[in-house]
Every structure is written in structure tokens, then in C-alpha cells.
Amino acid sequence: MPTAANLLAIMPFPDIDPIAFSIGPLAIHWYGLAYVAGILLGWAYARRLAANESLWPGNASPMTRTQLDDFIVWAALGVVLGGRLGYIFFYDLPAVLRSPVRALEIWNGGMSFHGGLTGTTIAMIIFARRNGIPIWSLFDIVATVVPFGLFFGRIANFINGELWGRLTDVPWAVVFPTGGPFARHPSQLYEAGLEGIVLLLVLAALVYGMRALKSPGFITGVFVCGYALSRIFVEFFREPDAQLGYLLGTNWLTMGMVLSSPMILLGLWAMLRARRQAALQL
């Protein structure tokens, strides 16, 4: 158990202004730049995947670059609207019911990955049906590039000094401006590493080393499982949302764990389904 003396002795938070720069009266926040960077890098990587026909079933890309360019708008709307609505529903519903205008206060924070995933999934299904694109291949393209957004988003969380971790005295602990006087796990960086870098590399190895895109849905399953396991692991180091705390009277169960646990089963199902479909085509 870390002592108060140890907790106070850890390095302070690197004081980074959450506003990256300003153009006249317009303030550009790091969090907004993170969204832009994640979407642009993901889009560029997705275009490379779509253009490489040898990666896909029958050596034929499931969608054109023009279709992919059109989908970016759908994806962005799915992420933003789904992320905001998901946060309201999963984490902040009582407060929004008391003051509905709170739902519009995006500048005060409040985005949910699970909500963004739901919103993007709905956008993908509608877009695929309207454009005659194999839905599982579209799922795979998006799953392969999502880690870019996760990485930059968690880095922005760290810069903003939000979503910090539990009390600790590890050498790399940080004293966050809004986290009290004691040192905490930089859990945002743990998530950036696992959900961003590690998951991106694993998926890239499967795409290029094992040609996993030739089994539509397999990459999606790996991503869903990988994210869920990473999130559940980091939740043991992350401070739960103040308005919810720990659930069911425990001192460890969080909403993040509850929302992520079913994703493991969903991901396993997607992988098994993809393998069965591939076997039937042999």
C-alpha cells in the first residue's frame, strides 16, 4: 500500500496547455487535433489497404477509394454522435435528465468509446447496404485503422489531465492538476500503448503476415477482443468516473469493465465465424 509520503514524492504533471494554439478568437484544443490526426491517418492507411487487392478475397478490393473517401464523413459522424450519446447514456444520464442542456456541452468533455463504436457500426451498416459493399470487409478496414484514433485520443486525455488512474507510488506516477495532491497511474498512457500501438501492430501483422483480410470478419474479431482485454486490464489502474464510482458494492468493478466484457464474446464469435466461412470455401 503506497504511503502518503511516497505519493507526494512522485513527479508532477507536465503542465501542458490543453489549447494547442489559437487563431484569433478561435482556440484549437489538443483533443480536437487528436480526432483530426486519428481520422486522417486512419483514412490514409485505409486507402492503402483498399488499394492493395492482393490482401482481399479473390484478389479484389471490396470498395473503391472514392467510396472510402465518402465513408469518412459517415465515420466521423458516427464517432462524434455515438460517442457523445454513449457517454450521456452510460455515464451521465441522471445529470442530463436534470439539465438537458448539459448534453450539448461537449466542451466540458464526455465521449464514450463504446458509444462511438456503436455509432460507427450503424454508419457502416447503412453505408455498406447503400453502396453494395461487403459489410464484414468494411468492418475489417475500419477495425484495422481505429487504433490510430485510440492512440491520439488517449494522449489528448493525458494532456488534458483527465481520466487519470488510481493512487500509486510507481516511479512513473504523475500528480494531475485535478486529481488531488497524490500521485496516480498515468492510465491514459497505458491505454494509448495497448489500445493504440500494440493493437495496431498486432492487426498489421495479421493483415500483411497472415493475409487475415481474406477471411472477412477475422480482423474485426481480433480488434474487438483486443480492445476489450486491453480496456479491462487498464481499468484496474484507472480511477472510475466520479459520478458512478465502483459498481455493485465492489472496490474494483467499473462501467468500462461491464461494457467491455461482452465484447470478448462478440470478438470470439466474429473470429470463429470468419474461420468457418473460410473453411466452407475451400
Swiss-Prot record:
Q: What is this protein called?
A: Phosphatidylglycerol--prolipoprotein diacylglyceryl transferase
Q: Which residues bind a 1,2-diacyl-sn-glycero-3-phospho-(1'-sn-glycerol)?
A: 154
Provide the transmembrane region boundaries.
23-43, 71-91, 106-126, 132-152, 189-209, 217-237, 252-272
Residues annotated as coiled-coil are none
State the disulfide connectivity. Answer: none
GO CC terms of this entry? plasma membrane
| Originating organism | Rhizobium leguminosarum bv. trifolii (strain WSM2304)
Pathway annotation: Protein modification; lipoprotein biosynthesis (diacylglyceryl transfer)
Annotated membrane topology is:
Multi-pass membrane protein
Q: Which Pfam families match?
A: LGT (PF01790)
What GO molecular functions are on record for this protein? phosphatidylglycerol-prolipoprotein diacylglyceryl transferase activity
Q: InterPro entries given for it?
A: Lgt (IPR001640)
Give a short account of what the protein does.
Catalyzes the transfer of the diacylglyceryl group from phosphatidylglycerol to the sulfhydryl group of the N-terminal cysteine of a prolipoprotein, the first step in the formation of mature lipoproteins.
Q: Provide a GO biological process annotation.
A: lipoprotein biosynthetic process
The entry's family comment says: Belongs to the Lgt family.
Domain of life of the source: Bacteria
- Cite the entry's keywords alphabetically: Cell inner membrane, Cell membrane, Membrane, Transferase, Transmembrane, Transmembrane helix
Cross-referenced HAMAP family: Lgt
Q: Where in the cell?
A: Cell inner membrane
- EC code(s) of this entry: 2.5.1.145
Query: Which top-level enzyme class is recorded in the Swiss-Prot or TrEMBL entry?
Result: transferase
